[in-house]
């Protein structure tokens, strides 16, 4: 399965945070097929003096989508993220890893609508550049 992620950070050494997240994804989820350049964005959905550094990532994995989600949440905790955004209340964070899209081995899009995971990521539809 091929999965697409967006990564974002607006605390600490942002470039190092992204590099560490990519390294952990490579080790725990699968082979990195491609990685975008890092790019800066303003906070979305809340006010902060800290701009975000973001990246997009494509990974080949043998994990199922919910396993990928659980693993990314473990990585976020390992890196110091103490809470997830709830009810669209956002805050500064060391790392945010969003699972955007998944494609099965036959290139069929994986569609999910569960309480834990929605694929494709619902905020992709509103044009959020860094989801």
Language model: regions and residue ranges:
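Short, charge-patterned binding micro-sites
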Residues: 36-60
